[in-house]
Amino acid sequence: MTAEEVADLRLRRYNATVVSLNLLNPDLMVLRVRPDFPRHPHHPGQYCTLGLGYWEPRVAGCQEETLPAGDETKVVRRAYSLSCSIYSEPGRLMRLEENDWFEFYIVLVRENPDGRVPALTPRLFALKKGDRIQVGERVTGHYTLDPVKDGDTVIFLGTGTGEAPHNYMTWELLGRGHTGKILNVCCVRYARDLGYRDTHTALMEQFPNYTYLPLTTREPGVTRKVYIQDLIASGELEERLGGTLDPARTHVFLCGNPKMIGVPHRDRDTGAMSYPQPVGAVEVLEARGFKADVAAIKLKGNVHFEEYW
């Protein structure tokens, strides 16, 4: 494909510009993109799509890709929850009207165990400031703070970049003066994967009702692996919260690895629910009196989830 053909495809297919890329480690970044269009009203916790053409370069060290004939002019897209850096400057929460960009928290997928070649993230990590990109004009999703009332306890449980929507939700809660306790748990493999750790530490110093709990499972020196499900079952989550888990006044938000979440399967004929194995957070919480959302029957519970996979 010639340079002129690539330039023409970019002109016709892209509608946003890369404002900044903050590479937190070789496989993790915070990406900000400015759309050509005015941002439509949306809610923290929702998502939109990012897209790049197959004609774009990929970073080195990723699974080898062989494109089928004709795919080189197509655009690959994926949905990403919107993230938020929460502060615009030390001690001052961001004001939405100050920014004209979307923020995304992205991990580089170098290869897939199932053999499917990662198409988008190796191209996203090859971007530079000023490059063009496609962003979906529609921000959507049901994973929002709508059911939360002031005074409710809010618990965010996320793995990896699944904390992205929780960052945005945290910003909204603190910005509107939420009086209930807020606990934000993020489980990652290594400490270097805690991309917003400094921000959360600063929030704890500024807001007495906010607690951040980072967990690492492969960090050298960690003698005991603690997964989110274990944290709930052992009672340690309540210790960190400083109170009991009361389903009547608590909302739990789960985002990340499907094995952590453990969404139950609903039998279409009988309506019976069955939990997957290994045990996920939904099963542990429902044993404590909580009830997960069931989209198929439009049931709104107090455990909400976004399968970020």
Predicted regions and their residues:
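Reductase modules of NAD(P)H-dependent flavoproteins
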Residues: 185, 190-309
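Generic structural signal for buried aliphatic residues
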Residues: 48-51, 133-135, 154
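Structural motif
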Residues: 153-155, 181-183, 251
